[in-house]
Amino acid sequence: MEPRISLVTLGVTDVARAKAFYEQLGWRGQEVEQTVFLQAGGMALVLWGRDKLAVDLGLEHGSPPGFTGVALAHNVRSQPEVDEIIAAAQGAGATITRSPSTTFYGGYAGVFVDLDSHAWEIAHNPGFPLAEDGSLTIPDFGSVQTAKRTP
């Protein structure tokens, strides 16, 4: 298996409502047979009916849980971008679960949940610089820790 993710599919209760929410945040996509495909760099974010997704995965469909054990993250290049995106999400109807603040890792982040309770962390992490195209490469943590210990 190649180490990459091609799609992240979010099970939603109302595809049209979810599409409108993400469009208010600047995402653009295509809807095909009640499924929305949003380009996200080199991968796709997919919005699909929660019940249909459960059937497709061979899982039981129940009511949306409070915490699913999954968090999505969107890294940005500056602290002001975190504030702007969190404000835009709130304006689009999201619930802010953690207001933007300094993090334990020296960054700055806030968290919102979308209209279907999917958690999104919006973060500026100086230890994870973004390339010009927005891609992220995991740093060599060994050299980062060594550098932090050097006076």
Task: Set out the residue ranges of the language-model regions.
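N-terminal beta-strand motif that seeds the catalytic metal site of vicinal oxygen chelate
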Residues: 1-17, 69-74, 126-151
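Core segments of cupin and vicinal oxygen chelate
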Residues: 2, 9-54
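Short, flexible, glycine-rich and Lys/Arg-enriched loop motifs at helix boundaries
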Residues: 50-63, 129-131
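Vicinal oxygen chelate
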Residues: 4-13, 36, 59-151
